[in-house]
Design a protein with these regions (language model features):
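Conserved beta-hairpin
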Residues: 45-59
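Conserved GNAT-fold acetyl-CoA-binding loop/helix
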Residues: 11-37
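A short beta-loop-alpha structural element at the N-terminal edge
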Residues: 1-8
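Conserved acetyl-CoA pyrophosphate-binding loop and the N-cap/start of the following alpha-helix
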Residues: 77, 81-89
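A short, internal acetyl-CoA/4′-phosphopantetheine-binding micro-motif in the GNAT/acyltransferase core
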Residues: 68-79
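C-terminal "cap" of GNAT-fold acetyltransferases
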Residues: 99, 104-110, 116, 122-150
Length: 150
């Protein structure tokens, strides 16, 4: 079902990619942040979208107002344009209602977001498990026609 697909994509991506960028405590933080309850709540509220290519589920994104959350593409599908297609979809959805998009950029995705025109507007740190620290950039992108602030 949808929950199992999203959980698998999210946790597999965190488990395979994030240890190359973060200490163990931060990886645990991401695993726990994207827990069953949060995923189920977002699904129930109609905020979650799944990317499918033929019969394979390869990615997911959550859209919450003007925020892009939980954007993951399975590692074996990286560098094939799927992330860009997911972002194209999410940006189109959000820009139809809002003049700017906001997201929290993890290290693995930061370069991707910069290349898509996002700029860091805030930097946050938080102490997590095992005396490790998570560092996150809050990034924004403005719509080409910045007239409609909804």
């Amino acid at each position: 079902d949808t929950f199992d697909i999203i959980k698998r994509i999210t946790q597999d991506t965190i488990n395979q990619v994030y240890p190359h960028y973060y200490p163990a405590g931060v990886v645990v933080f991401f695993q726990e942040h994207h827990n069953d309850s949060n995923i189920l709540t977002d699904i129930a509220q109609g905020k979650v979208f799944v990317v499918q290519d033929k019969d394979e589920y390869i990615g997911t994104v959550t859209i919450d107002g003007n925020e892009i959350n939980r954007l993951f593409v399975l590692p074996q599908f990286h560098k094939n344009g799927y992330g860009s297609k997911v972002m194209d979809f999410a940006e189109k959805e959000i820009f139809s209602k809002y003049s700017k998009i906001q997201l929290h950029a993890s290290l693995p995705g930061k370069k991707f977001y910069i290349e898509r025109g996002y700029s860091a507007v805030e930097y946050r740190t938080k102490k997590v498990c095992c005396d490790d620290w998570i560092c996150i950039d809050i990034m924004e992108k403005r719509a080409p026609d910045v007239e409609k602030e909804k």
